[in-house]
Curated annotation (Swiss-Prot):
Gene that this sequence comes from: FIP1
Region (Disordered): 1-114
Compositionally biased intervals (Acidic residues): 42-59
Record-given protein name: Pre-mRNA polyadenylation factor FIP1
Subcellular location: Nucleus
GO BP field: mRNA processing
Family according to the record: Belongs to the FIP1 family.
Length: 221
């Protein structure tokens, strides 16, 4: 049985014999090689440890960097927020001043006034002295004409003519020259004072000049 095994699988004796036959120098050469291999094995272990350490450091850096960035970003945002809040009132003050200046009422421009007491003029002549019968066309008599385009204050052709006649009559009656003539005639008919003099007014002054006084009077309208 052993012979069959030896035939099939071989024996270890030839290998032992070869090991014995090998020279001593070869064994010496192999021993340093084995030692170097043995010495290199720890280095490989150290390299693997370094690699594992490096991998651990990489993991720590990757996980820690976002938190640091987030913390720095939040700190920067907090610093910028007060600056923006402090700058906001300065920006809001300027529009208030502008709005205050815009709301100030501007002084109204003085418009030229109209003298309502002055009589209107037409062709260099007071309008009250014009006779409506002297107009040839008389446009206010045309069919469809608006009387208010030619007469104001409810006047028409006939009431306007009556008003003008009355105004001319009043002005004629209150003419200063006519008034002085009438007053002179009335004074001439009065009896003379004793001593041929006029009665002095209080204060020793005579009667003022009636002509000047009448000139200062405005005729009624």
């Amino acid at each position: 049985m052993d012979d069959d095994d030896d035939f099939l699988y071989g024996t270890e004796e030839p290998a032992v014999k070869r090991a014995r036959v090998e020279p001593e120098g070869a064994e010496d050469d192999e021993e340093p090689h084995s030692q170097t291999t043995k010495q290199q094995e720890p280095e490989d272990d150290s390299d693997s440890e370094y690699e594992s350490d490096d991998s651990d450091i990489d993991i720590v850096i990757d996980t820690g960097a976002p938190s640091k960035l987030a913390s720095t970003a939040s700190a920067a945002a907090k610093k910028e927020a007060p600056a923006a809040s402090s700058a906001a009132p300065e920006a809001s003050d300027t529009p208030k001043e502008e709005s205050a200046s815009e709301e100030r009422p501007q002084p109204a421009a003085k418009m030229p006034g109209i003298d309502i007491e002055k009589v209107g003029m037409l062709d260099g002549k007071p309008i009250t002295e014009h006779n409506l019968e002297d107009f040839e066309d008389k446009p206010w008599r045309m069919p469809g004409a608006d009387i208010t385009d030619y007469f104001n204050y409810g006047f028409d052709e006939f009431t306007w003519m009556a008003y003008c006649d009355k105004q001319n009559q009043i002005r004629g009656e209150y003419n200063p020259q006519n008034m002085m003539a009438m007053m002179g005639m009335s004074m001439m008919g009065m009896p003379g004072m004793p001593g041929g003099g006029q009665m002095p007014m209080p204060g020793g002054e005579g009667m003022p000049d009636m002509f000047k006084m009448m000139q200062g009077m405005n005729p009624p309208k």
